[in-house]
């Protein structure tokens, strides 16, 4: 099974982007969760508006699906300015970035998703633009080439990344506002599910929303995706309303268990428990045992299991924790 096949993957798939857009909150007061980040942003935005200045450059980082793009849109809405969106891989040449920068108006937000994937050439252009609101452009080629400086209006760069450590130090240092997004708790996710259901015109009770939230791996994008699949089940198998029982039946049918694990998560945990006596087991052996690439385990399967305390990463290899044994109704050997 590859990552794109998984219902509970946090990355965008299918029509996620179009549907997520319809459900996105527009203002900070509508945004649920990330309380510390929200409180900080309210202060920074109000201060910038009082001084009639562009907001400082902002780096939003954290696991995928937590609302980095949504937050960038909200910043633009709160500041009352336009937002232009792009992503690191799209900006292949310096001219691609220059075209975007020269079309910005004073105070506008430039949002670059996957900013850790910017090419070095494009990144070099970005430094003076961020620091001095200037664009250095080379005119001509060879010995006759010369550099000219263009003044840019004050703007706010909002960079988003799932891998803050992959940013170069010079780029990271130019962001005045670093914001880390954390996984959501069940209460906040339940609120998000309820709001999304209202947008969809779907009847859902609090227990139904909580059941979906519990299995959403702390991620709003997954919660909204599961909600859409539960709606399908409710309309076909029941009267269209989502209760706890309906949500449980639908998610069990989809093979998403009470912890938000799917077949691949359980396969990985059981391999450590059954084939390697709970570990420690090296990554290459584990990959061979479950028929997956080591990169898939490291980047896709492991992070959530480690974050939730089901796997422990040690110098000698991976170990299944007591919590992993309990999940399958087993007792961990002493």
UniProtKB/Swiss-Prot annotation:
Positions of DNA binding: 294, 313, 318
MF GO annotations: ATP binding; ATP hydrolysis activity; four-way junction DNA binding; four-way junction helicase activity
EC number: 3.6.4.-
One Pfam family of this chain: AAA_lid_4
Catalytic reaction equation(s): ATP + H2O = ADP + phosphate + H(+)
Binding site for Mg(2+): 69
SUPFAM superfamilies in the cross-refs: P-loop containing nucleoside triphosphate hydrolases, Winged helix' DNA-binding domain
Location relative to the cell: Cytoplasm
Region spans: Head domain (RuvB-H): 258-334
Major subcellular site: cytoplasm
Principal EC category: hydrolase
UniProt comment concerning the protein's domains: Has 3 domains, the large (RuvB-L) and small ATPase (RuvB-S) domains and the C-terminal head (RuvB-H) domain. The head domain binds DNA, while the ATPase domains jointly bind ATP, ADP or are empty depending on the state of the subunit in the translocation cycle. During a single DNA translocation step the structure of each domain remains the same, but their relative positions change.
Stated family: Belongs to the RuvB family.
NCBIfam families per UniProt: PRK00080.1 (NF000868), ruvB (TIGR00635)
Functional note: The RuvA-RuvB-RuvC complex processes Holliday junction (HJ) DNA during genetic recombination and DNA repair, while the RuvA-RuvB complex plays an important role in the rescue of blocked DNA replication forks via replication fork reversal (RFR). RuvA specifically binds to HJ cruciform DNA, conferring on it an open structure. The RuvB hexamer acts as an ATP-dependent pump, pulling dsDNA into and through the RuvAB complex. RuvB forms 2 homohexamers on either side of HJ DNA bound by 1 or 2 RuvA tetramers; 4 subunits per hexamer contact DNA at a time.
Protein name as it appears in the record: Holliday junction branch migration complex subunit RuvB
